[in-house]
Amino acid sequence: MILQAHLHSLCLLMLYLATGYGQEGKFSGPLKPMTFSIYEGQEPSQIIFQFKANPPAVTFELTGETDNIFVIEREGLLYYNRALDRETRSTHNLQVAALDANGIIVEGPVPITIKVKDINDNRPTFLQSKYEGSVRQNSRPGKPFLYVNATDLDDPATPNGQLYYQIVIQLPMINNVMYFQINNKTGAISLTREGSQELNPAKNPSYNLVISVKDMGGQSENSFSDTTSVDIIVTENIWKAPKPVEMVENSTDPHPIKITQVRWNDPGAQYSLVDKEKLPRFPFSIDQEGDIYVTQPLDREEKDAYVFYAVAKDEYGKPLSYPLEIHVKVKDINDNPPTCPSPVTVFEVQENERLGNSIGTLTAHDRDEENTANSFLNYRIVEQTPKLPMDGLFLIQTYAGMLQLAKQSLKKQDTPQYNLTIEVSDKDFKTLCFVQINVIDINDQIPIFEKSDYGNLTLAEDTNIGSTILTIQATDADEPFTGSSKILYHIIKGDSEGRLGVDTDPHTNTGYVIIKKPLDFETAAVSNIVFKAENPEPLVFGVKYNASSFAKFTLIVTDVNEAPQFSQHVFQAKVSEDVAIGTKVGNVTAKDPEGLDISYSLRGDTRGWLKIDHVTGEIFSVAPLDREAGSPYRVQVVATEVGGSSLSSVSEFHLILMDVNDNPPRLAKDYTGLFFCHPLSAPGSLIFEATDDDQHLFRGPHFTFSLGSGSLQNDWEVSKINGTHARLSTRHTEFEEREYVVLIRINDGGRPPLEGIVSLPVTFCSCVEGSCFRPAGHQTGIPTVGMAVGILLTTLLVIGIILAVVFIRIKKDKGKDNVESAQASEVKPLRS
């Protein structure tokens, strides 16, 4: 046995020398902490590294997670003798120490980390051989109603462990249309748009799906796979808009009054109403059972119909489905009397008016609903004043209100005016209206133009609209200021486009010819206009309009070089924001009145997204479009004459970008500062919110959440709360007092699905009164206690020195005074 071991060591040594491991560098070196990566499943007896011994070390010792796989020879050769398995242990933590001849550690031990790299040696496996679920008809497309889950023991951070789900077959398959779809990454099953519209439990109450899962992200021919079966029951969706409601106006019943109801499919929904029209007064409410009420009497004359939305939300305020449209029609009651068109309605009648001729029509109004009995009016003459030469000179059509002459006995000199009182009634109300009928002279004179030819007039085609270009005049010898003498001017020839009009002065009968529409040299350079003057009252029998009532006029329009004219003031186009570069996104058209060619250009393309064909006006994309950066995207289009004076005109082009799923999810806000108090007494959790910049309309985002790395699964778990919120929870309480960065993978379930990996920093720290306590360090510029004591002692020392100097100086001054006193007494002369 000993001989066999020595032989094995000798073979390794020879292999080691033959392959160059003995050279200092990549494969050999001094004893120090090191990390090695080795693929699992490789042949054993592979040399990993040669450690060099420094005297007095003569041999090496290996400890740690060797699993009887890793061995170190006395000479320092580290190798493994069996194939590694990442799924058994992904990391081996070893320690190597150098020993002297007596077996005493003289160097180390140092950590040696062996990381086992993954190979694709495990097939994915569904957690269940069969799944069952249910979905309601008309459920929102893309909203998951069931998840299938598979596991793969390979490393999820590599393609080996990345799973790809797909639907193999749908049974039954109706018209070759897929009603179901699956998120390739998460296994979330939802309805397609066709499934949302066409699923009907009355026709097909159940479906079966065969789902496959592949590893290698489904991108390799050598992928391992597994399949499972999914049985789906289609249930009726009771979240449906109710039938339109009719509510009688001005109801005197106690309010609120229940008028209809909506119901979500499951209990616990929170209901609300949304005023679609943003009315200042919204007279409806809904309770938490889904019953809808009118809260006050309605007035049909104020508003005859209401349209609003009923919304169902979950406990977090997120919509459960699309809102339902509620229609309420206000039913009319007869609560309005007829009204007269004016206090007094005036008509004129010629004294020789023929029997039965129409004098005029009295049109009363009723605010109740049109074309119903409530607004159906009857007319009746109740009084004629004066009754000369007899009563009953006039009659009125009962339902039309048209007044007619009943008897041919009118004479202006005897009775120039009649007053009628007319009763207008609906089925419940009556109103009196007053009509004044003026008897006027017979219309036996025609209008006569003062001249029959108003000559020629030359105008530029850009003459302003509203300009008066000509004054015409006709006279009438009938009774002044009556319908027999009033003159109306009409253009009967030469202006088929209606570019001109004539206004009449009622006091002078003067006609003013004005420009109503732009003149155009290109279509009407010369117009031969014919005017006709006539009265609003009919002429008496035997009198007809003749040439005296007609006049002519020639209008000559001169050319003006006009700018090109766009066919529209604003052009709009709608495209998906992910269209390929070079795609035609719209076009504009303009014409030059003079027929010149036009060159198109763009102005205000601040993002450089578009180009325009200068000849055809077709607009193309030249860069990636982004709805989130700007939609609608507004630019100006310039049309310029080619040649001539190069006049130009400008129109707007609005490009509406339809959203695609091109923004990965992210955290809704900065979550710096999340913490748990250390040590944990029980597992804890934190709630966070995700968002993205794509458009979600009513349904809002529906994210799914998972941990961003398989290495986090022992410490953390993440669970979905709703479409935007999730809970991060600890799996145990044994955390160190430090900051952890937890990676979260967020999938938006869109088409195509996008994922974002975000970081949540979570700190485990000591707490004081529920807050994270971090000891304050020394701050630059603030003295420490030692510094303060030093400053104080220095100050006292300086004061002491100053006092000592002062005292010494005082003492010296005293000594000097004493000497001077002594000397003075010694020289004083003696007296005898």
Swiss-Prot record:
<dbReference type="InterPro" id="IPR020894">
    <property type="entry name" value="Cadherin_CS"/>
</dbReference>
<feature type="domain" description="Cadherin 3">
    <location>
        <begin position="245"/>
        <end position="340"/>
    </location>
</feature>
<feature type="glycosylation site" description="N-linked (GlcNAc...) asparagine">
    <location>
        <position position="419"/>
    </location>
</feature>
<feature type="domain" description="Cadherin 6">
    <location>
        <begin position="567"/>
        <end position="667"/>
    </location>
</feature>
<feature type="signal peptide">
    <location>
        <begin position="1"/>
        <end position="22"/>
    </location>
</feature>
<keyword id="KW-0677">Repeat</keyword>
<dbReference type="GO" id="GO:0000902">
    <property type="term" value="P:cell morphogenesis"/>
</dbReference>
<feature type="domain" description="Cadherin 7">
    <location>
        <begin position="668"/>
        <end position="777"/>
    </location>
</feature>
<dbReference type="GO" id="GO:0034332">
    <property type="term" value="P:adherens junction organization"/>
</dbReference>
<feature type="glycosylation site" description="N-linked (GlcNAc...) asparagine">
    <location>
        <position position="149"/>
    </location>
</feature>
<keyword id="KW-0130">Cell adhesion</keyword>
<feature type="glycosylation site" description="N-linked (GlcNAc...) asparagine">
    <location>
        <position position="250"/>
    </location>
</feature>
<dbReference type="GO" id="GO:0045296">
    <property type="term" value="F:cadherin binding"/>
</dbReference>
<keyword id="KW-0106">Calcium</keyword>
<dbReference type="GO" id="GO:0030054">
    <property type="term" value="C:cell junction"/>
</dbReference>
<dbReference type="GO" id="GO:0007156">
    <property type="term" value="P:homophilic cell adhesion via plasma membrane adhesion molecules"/>
</dbReference>
<keyword id="KW-0472">Membrane</keyword>
<dbReference type="GO" id="GO:0007043">
    <property type="term" value="P:cell-cell junction assembly"/>
</dbReference>
<dbReference type="GO" id="GO:0005912">
    <property type="term" value="C:adherens junction"/>
</dbReference>
<dbReference type="GO" id="GO:0009986">
    <property type="term" value="C:cell surface"/>
</dbReference>
<dbReference type="InterPro" id="IPR002126">
    <property type="entry name" value="Cadherin-like_dom"/>
</dbReference>
<dbReference type="GO" id="GO:0048536">
    <property type="term" value="P:spleen development"/>
</dbReference>
<dbReference type="GO" id="GO:0016477">
    <property type="term" value="P:cell migration"/>
</dbReference>
<feature type="glycosylation site" description="N-linked (GlcNAc...) asparagine">
    <location>
        <position position="456"/>
    </location>
</feature>
<keyword id="KW-0479">Metal-binding</keyword>
<dbReference type="GO" id="GO:0002314">
    <property type="term" value="P:germinal center B cell differentiation"/>
</dbReference>
<keyword id="KW-1133">Transmembrane helix</keyword>
<comment type="function">
    <text>Cadherins are calcium-dependent cell adhesion proteins. They preferentially interact with themselves in a homophilic manner in connecting cells; cadherins may thus contribute to the sorting of heterogeneous cell types. LI-cadherin may have a role in the morphological organization of liver and intestine. Involved in intestinal peptide transport.</text>
</comment>
<dbReference type="GO" id="GO:0007229">
    <property type="term" value="P:integrin-mediated signaling pathway"/>
</dbReference>
<feature type="glycosylation site" description="N-linked (GlcNAc...) asparagine">
    <location>
        <position position="587"/>
    </location>
</feature>
<dbReference type="GO" id="GO:0005886">
    <property type="term" value="C:plasma membrane"/>
</dbReference>
<keyword id="KW-0813">Transport</keyword>
<dbReference type="InterPro" id="IPR039808">
    <property type="entry name" value="Cadherin"/>
</dbReference>
<dbReference type="GO" id="GO:0035672">
    <property type="term" value="P:oligopeptide transmembrane transport"/>
</dbReference>
<dbReference type="GO" id="GO:0005427">
    <property type="term" value="F:proton-dependent oligopeptide secondary active transmembrane transporter activity"/>
</dbReference>
<feature type="transmembrane region" description="Helical">
    <location>
        <begin position="788"/>
        <end position="808"/>
    </location>
</feature>
<dbReference type="GO" id="GO:0007155">
    <property type="term" value="P:cell adhesion"/>
</dbReference>
<feature type="topological domain" description="Extracellular">
    <location>
        <begin position="23"/>
        <end position="787"/>
    </location>
</feature>
<feature type="glycosylation site" description="N-linked (GlcNAc...) asparagine">
    <location>
        <position position="546"/>
    </location>
</feature>
<dbReference type="Pfam" id="PF00028">
    <property type="entry name" value="Cadherin"/>
</dbReference>
<feature type="domain" description="Cadherin 2">
    <location>
        <begin position="129"/>
        <end position="244"/>
    </location>
</feature>
<dbReference type="GO" id="GO:0005654">
    <property type="term" value="C:nucleoplasm"/>
</dbReference>
